[in-house]
Amino acid sequence: MSNIVFMGTPRFAVPILKKINQKYKINCVFTQPPSKSNRGQKFTKSPIHTCAEGLNLEIKTPKKIDEEYEYLKELNLDLVIVVAYGQLISKKILELSKKGFLNIHASLLPKWRGAAPIQRSILNNEKKTGISFMKIDEKLDSGPVCNK
């Protein structure tokens, strides 16, 4: 596979990006735009943004992923790996990848789909949790699960 894009934002996604980057060439990393945080309200880059800079990877931070439709189309995508990216991905973007979009989700789907699955597992005293691999469709965390 030669045309891979990674989409992610939080710290949870950092070791996954690093591991994939060791074995495959990642064409570009998409993450959320820097946001104001802390008392000084300074703009802060996401953990994935900082990691991708350290790995010398190209970075895109669109407010809406559809803004990058033409760019993604030109990449002739083979696979897109998504880890807690924070945006719903439209059908027209999903159709650009030959092998689809693979989501790595921090819960045993279908339980705790959506945002903050780790926190919700803890708050609900789950005895067992894990990670799910699923193909992305147009709905939130509802595509077919490949592995848990």
Regions found by a protein language model. Name each.
Residues 1-40:
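N-terminal Rossmann-like dinucleotide-binding module
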Residues 22, 55, 96-97:
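Short, structured coil segments at secondary-structure junctions
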Residues 35-53:
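N-terminal beta-loop-helix "entrance" segment that forms/cooperates
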Residues 47-59, 79-82:
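Short, structured active-site "lid" loops
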Residues 58-68:
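Glycine-rich, highly charged phosphate/nucleotide-binding loops
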Residues 66-76, 95:
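Short amphipathic alpha-helix with an adjacent loop that forms part of the alpha/beta core around
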Residues 79-148:
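Donor/substrate-binding cores of folate-linked one-carbon enzymes
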